[in-house]
Structures are given as C-alpha cells and as structure tokens.
C-alpha cells in the first residue's frame, strides 16, 4: 500500500517546500497532500506531518524526518489508519465550521 504524507502550507512551524523535498526523497512513490491540516496549535511551535494519517511533530525538520523514517518501518494497521483518517476529517470539518461561523459574526458586525 502506498504511503501518504499530509503537510501544511499555512502553519508557522512548517517549511512546506523543504519538507516536501525531504519526504519525496524518503519515499518517491508516496502521495503528498499539501494544505491546511487543521493542526494549528502544534503547527505554531513545531514542524509536523501526517504519515499515513498519524500525526508526527518535532522541534526541527531533521528530528521530524527521523520520526517519519521510524514510522515507515513499523507494520501498518489499516483499521487504525482508517480510524485516524476519519478523526482527521472530523477535525478539519470542525475547523471549517468554526471559520465559517467566525466569518458570519464578522460580517454581521460590519453591517451594524
């Protein structure tokens, strides 16, 4: 089964371009999805990536890559990955809902 990496192009702690290059070098066949991962809290202070739906974070990109390599060596549990995928989707959905409500409130304040 193909590995999948999810990285954020919005968080302060993530250098998307260099991280994407390192992940591609590590596994050229992996699918890499770039976009908001709704992992903003840790993403302010740490670099992170989701590896097969499992979040991994570290203070530096090199430390993160060590964790990614270790994670890729572990046997994959497809049921666990599916559970994590659903959890990640729900987290993104909740963040989108919060953002939508905030925009509505701001729009209402402008019209007053």
Swiss-Prot record:
High-level lineage: Bacteria, Bacillati, Bacillota, Bacilli, Bacillales
Region described as Disordered: 68-112
Listed name of the protein: UPF0741 protein SSP2119
Family stated for the protein in its record: Belongs to the UPF0741 family.
Disulfide bond positions: none
Coiled coil: 75-112
Keywords: Coiled coil
């Amino acid at each position: 089964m193909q590995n999948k990496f999810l990285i954020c192009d919005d968080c302060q702690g993530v250098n998307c371009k260099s991280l994407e290059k390192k992940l591609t070098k590590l596994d050229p066949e992996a699918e890499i999805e770039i976009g908001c991962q709704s992992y903003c809290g840790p993403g302010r202070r740490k670099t992170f990536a989701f590896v097969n739906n499992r979040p991994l974070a570290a203070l530096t990109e090199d430390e993160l890559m060590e964790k990614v390599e270790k994670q890729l060596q572990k046997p994959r549990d497809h049921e666990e990955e599916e559970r994590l995928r659903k959890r990640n989707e729900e987290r993104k959905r909740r963040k989108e809902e919060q953002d939508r409500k905030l925009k509505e409130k701001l729009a209402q304040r402008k019209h007053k």
